[in-house]
């Protein structure tokens, strides 16, 4: 990695998880068009997120990251964006109050279209076709035409991301994020929840605090009516990402302006690979998914490449172990990081290591396993004397039935009722809020 970096230096290295486009000239034309379009985000915003990440790394804030497994063209609507944003706000206010610290809010939104796959092809009833890699690449329909990778989908992804970002900015700054309104939504959730008795005391304390602030004349403060919200996605399709690399006029640094934060998946984190090469050169805050196959030596080498200056706001290690593997694998990684004095933000992805197949054939996740991994993540960090800095979840504001369990339990038999995901199962609004209240209890104990 001592070679000079450029936005296209990744093209000379081995690359994983890429579609096979049949028309290279068409792809090159689309890449050129994308590069001529305005950026989706600005360097100053990415710098601000990096500053906030540093606060998390140093134990002064907490990271909440959530959103769709994969955004889709078919389910694109203002209502769906609003509902997911709303639930993230609800989760954040509970965590903020319990932890007594700021919660950095990052959505898997406005760009989370591409998905890595375990195989290049898919076979059903003896018919083999290219795997569905997300709407940015090909269609989900199991027919030859749908599954051909189409460069025009890159353009559609850009336009949908633009509209999504526009709406998110309006929601964040236009009064929708008012703390009083968000708290009212939480009161409605608790009133209709089986957990009412357990969490009503926390809601009452938030109510009292807001009433006190109102009595002091602080209810019109911008801090109560507006919020900061950032976007992120997996940097998987590097031809798309390269098109949004811009040089900041203030610092002369390169930024990938397709999102505020980008991350590398567990399948594409090879030290000699294209994805690591690309992300080492952009100045955004970045993440790496860390699974049970990661060993301490490789992790340290990866950190050295991606965060050579040991900046506390640069690198988020996203642990995705599985509930039954956290205790066996996470401690040795934390110890290696501490031993080498590396400054990283640790967060937990309790989703990807806990995917199972129900007897009905649906892919699902058990809420008890999700919660179990989160609890163990906190316990391991407490035992090691380190800071559990965040949570990274796949969720939606919609009332879907994709993950089993929760206070309003979804059973395996009920999965088919509203199973809408284009890829992996997501927690619904109730399950997400239940998780937030449970994490809030843990944060309160940790930060005493």
Question: Over which residues does each language-model region extend?
Answer:
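Glycine-rich, charged/polar anion/phosphate-binding loops
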Residues: 48-50, 272-275, 302, 330-333
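Short acidic (Asp/Glu) and glycine-rich catalytic loops that position anionic groups and cofactors
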Residues: 62-70, 280-282, 311-313, 352-357, ...
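N-terminal charge/polar-biased segments
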Residues: 1-37, 405-448
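Long, contiguous, compositionally biased segments that the model treats as domain-scale units
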Residues: 1-136
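Non-transmembrane, aqueous-exposed alpha-helical and coiled segments at domain scale
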Residues: 299-309, 313-346, 352-404
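Short, glycine-/Ser/Thr-/acidic-enriched flexible segments
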Residues: 69-71, 109-111, 293, 322-324, ...
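Active-site-facing alpha/beta catalytic cores
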Residues: 76-322, 365, 390-392, 409-448
